[in-house]
Amino acid sequence: MIPARGEVWLHERPKRKARPVLVLLRSEAVESLNRILVVPTTTEGMRRIPTHVWIDEDDGMREPCALTLDETFAARKDLLTHRITVLGAEKMHEVCLALAVATSCS
């Protein structure tokens, strides 16, 4: 299965704790790249700030967490091991707004 934009996948890096990440890169580019743009999640230090988007059980997650748009990075696609959930259009709109704040592109 190939990751697609809006999907949350488990990112398993060697010698590090596995954690969910949101695929942010447009789906058309994912297949041809080895690294794809993702947003990590956190359950620690969750704050209500403009660059965090909260996701929870209603979004298909096991526990509440925050997508941290300030920490967006390029992940190796082969380290995304299984899909957890797919975020809806409304939640992805929140992600896009938070990304605009994180990058000062608003």
Language-model features, listed with the residues they occupy:
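C-terminal terminal-subdomain/extension
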Residues: 1, 57-106
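Short linear motifs in intrinsically disordered
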Residues: 1-2, 44
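Compact nucleic-acid interaction/catalytic patches
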Residues: 17-57
